[in-house]
Structure formats: structure tokens, C-alpha cells
């Protein structure tokens, strides 16, 4: 059984690849068109774009942190027509050593994802974060974005 056979593993694999900065692994979990909703965290609008655009957006931010770690709870799945709706708790930790205002930023909430079968494999076609709360230095994303452009951290080895 591959990660694309097990819907819950697709979401877990995505988050592991994000934390490792393994961009081919991230892209492999996504549909060609993806809707992302981080409005409860960052404001703005729901984004609809390509999987490649989403990877590029994450590449412009996440390598600026010294480390990220996304921890999820059990993943619940519910059929919705030909798709599956997944939900899980998430605690996302972000670290940037020596940052003014504190080196940790935590985002805690619930991920909701829609998985669509594409050529027999499950892919994420929608991803939304439903916020519970944040803690720590909420200015870290801005600092990490600047650092990602100038001195990004190196990827970690891919996790199976």
C-alpha cells in the first residue's frame, strides 16, 4: 500500500514533506488545482491556484524558519460524492533562533482537506485551517519570509 492508497497518509505525508522542505514530496500530494484557506490565520481571501503555485508560496516562507513541525491527531475521513473529506487536529510549531520578540510561533487548530482521486491516487484538492489559537511570536512569518529569500535553511532527508 502506498501513501496515495491511504487517504490519511496523504495528509501526513504532505506535512512531513513540508517540515523536511522536500518540495517534490509536497507537490506529489497535491492535485493540479488546489484551494487553500488560511483566512482564519492570515486574513485575506481563499486562494485558488495550481499545486505548483502553492509549493512556490510555501518555498518563499518555510525555509526561513530554522525548523517547523506539524503534529496531527487521528485523521477522520468522510465520503463526499467521489471525494473524501478529512479532518484532524493540528499543532504547528515554527522556530527562528534569536528572533526579536521570541523564537517560537505556534499555530493550533483543525485541518480540513478534500481529497480527490486522480489517476487512481488520492490528492489534496482543498486544504483549510480552522484556527483555535496562536501563541508566541506572531511576527515570525514576516521574518522567515525575509530570511527565506536571503539565507534559507537546507532541506532535511526525505522521510519514508
Predicted feature descriptions by range:
Residues 1-32:
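Short, low-complexity N-terminal intrinsically disordered segments enriched in polar/charged residues
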Residues 4-5, 56, 94:
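Generic signal for short, ordered secondary-structure residues
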Residues 22-25, 37, 129, 137:
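Poly-acidic low-complexity segments
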Residues 63-160:
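A beta-strand edge to alpha-helix "cap/lid" segment located at domain peripheries
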Residues 25-91:
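A solvent-exposed, acidic/Ser-Thr-rich amphipathic alpha-helical stretch
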Residues 3, 7, 19, 47, ...:
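Aromatic-acidic/polar surface patches that form glycan- and anion
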Amino acid at each position: 500500500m502506498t501513501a496515495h492508497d491511504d487517504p490519511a497518509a496523504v495528509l501526513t505525508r504532505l506535512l512531513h514533506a513540508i517540515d523536511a522542505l522536500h518540495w517534490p514530496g509536497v507537490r506529489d500530494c497535491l492535485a493540479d488545482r488546489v484551494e487553500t484557506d488560511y483566512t482564519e490565520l492570515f486574513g485575506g481571501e481563499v486562494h485558488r491556484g495550481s499545486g505548483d503555485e502553492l509549493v512556490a508560496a510555501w518555498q518563499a516562507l518555510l525555509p526561513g524558519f530554522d525548523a517547523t513541525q506539524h503534529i496531527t491527531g487521528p485523521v477522520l475521513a468522510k465520503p463526499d460524492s467521489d471525494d473524501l473529506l478529512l479532518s484532524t487536529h493540528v499543532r504547528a510549531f515554527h522556530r527562528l533562533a534569536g528572533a526579536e520578540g521570541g523564537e517560537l510561533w505556534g499555530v493550533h487548530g483543525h485541518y480540513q482537506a478534500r481529497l480527490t482521486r486522480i489517476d487512481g491516487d488520492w490528492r489534496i484538492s482543498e486544504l483549510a485551517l480552522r484556527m483555535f489559537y496562536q501563541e508566541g511570536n506572531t511576527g515570525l512569518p514576516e521574518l522567515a519570509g525575509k530570511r527565506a529569500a536571503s539565507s534559507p535553511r537546507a532541506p532535511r532527508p526525505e522521510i519514508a
